[in-house]
């Protein structure tokens, strides 16, 4: 029996490739969000993109006519803060972090209580990678130097998300997973990823809103991050074909959604 969307109250929405592409909001997204509210539900924008803060996303959605507040977002940057705090006990106990990431990502980490440095010569304790739209070769070189140096094995290697590419209007650009891939090839070290497909972000959203797993639906365009996150979090998921993933990908994927839809408009018609 196919899942009934009308039973769902919490909708976890991926962003890039699911509700918009670059600065173009997909048709039906605004109506979908309004319908969720009318039905007494809640939606959380849940993105693996760590290059922007919640404030950045609020401003971006506002230009598309979508009103949102900080509590409407769970980003992979939030997952990083949650994960590092779980591992080290507190942000202050994590030591110095060398970040391969944007200024916006760095600002959020500092706001959350972490110490960020751009000097690899200092006593760095953690190498952290995100989706870095400000990437330089020096950052990559510094990251490799840290992991291969005398203290390399004692340095924690973490990353926001394993996405290989980010969809844009002209196709794709390298995402965090590709950046980490270069470092892994050079050093043999793999990072621990905190974002999707790990269940952490979905669990954070459910805890924040108070909805159960049975009441939750995750909607995304990537099988290996979005749909895998749904499986790992033990919640239903919807695979939309408006972004990276295709039906051909679905045929061979170990990650299977509860439903497949061309785009958000199809879900709206079933509510």
Stretches with model-predicted labels:
Residues 2-13, 20-38, 52-74, 81-271:
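Asp-based, Mg2+/Mn2+-dependent phosphohydrolase catalytic module
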């Amino acid at each position: 029996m196919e899942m009934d969307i009308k039973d769902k109250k919490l909708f976890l929405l991926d962003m890039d490739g699911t509700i918009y592409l670059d600065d173009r909001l997909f048709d039906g997204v605004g109506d979908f969000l309004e319908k969720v509210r009318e039905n007494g539900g809640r939606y959380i924008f849940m993105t693996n993109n760590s290059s922007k803060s919640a404030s950045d996303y609020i401003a971006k959605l506002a230009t598309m006519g979508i009103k949102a507040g900080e509590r409407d977002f769970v980003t992979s940057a939030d997952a990083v803060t949650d994960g590092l705090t779980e591992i080290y006990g507190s942000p202050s106990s994590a030591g110095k972090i060398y970040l391969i990431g944007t200024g916006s990502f760095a600002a959020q980490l500092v706001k959350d209580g972490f110490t960020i440095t751009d000097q690899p010569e200092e006593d760095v304790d953690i190498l952290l990678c995100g989706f870095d739209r400000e990437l330089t070769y020096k950052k990559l070189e510094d990251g490799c130097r840290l992991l291969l140096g005398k203290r390399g094995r004692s340095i924690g290697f973490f990353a926001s998300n394993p996405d290989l590419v980010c969809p844009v209007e002209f196709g794709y650009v390298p995402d965090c997973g590709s950046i980490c891939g270069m470092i892994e090839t050079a050093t043999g070290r793999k990072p621990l990823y905190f974002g999707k497909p790990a269940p952490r972000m979905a669990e954070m959203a459910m805890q924040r809103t108070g909805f159960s797993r049975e009441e939750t639906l995750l909607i995304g365009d990537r099988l290996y991050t979005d749909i895998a996150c749904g499986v790992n979090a033990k919640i239903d998921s919807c695979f939309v074909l408006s972004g990276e993933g295709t039906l051909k990908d679905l045929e061979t994927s170990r990650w299977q959604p509860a439903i497949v839809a061309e785009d958000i408009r199809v879900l709206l018609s079933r509510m």
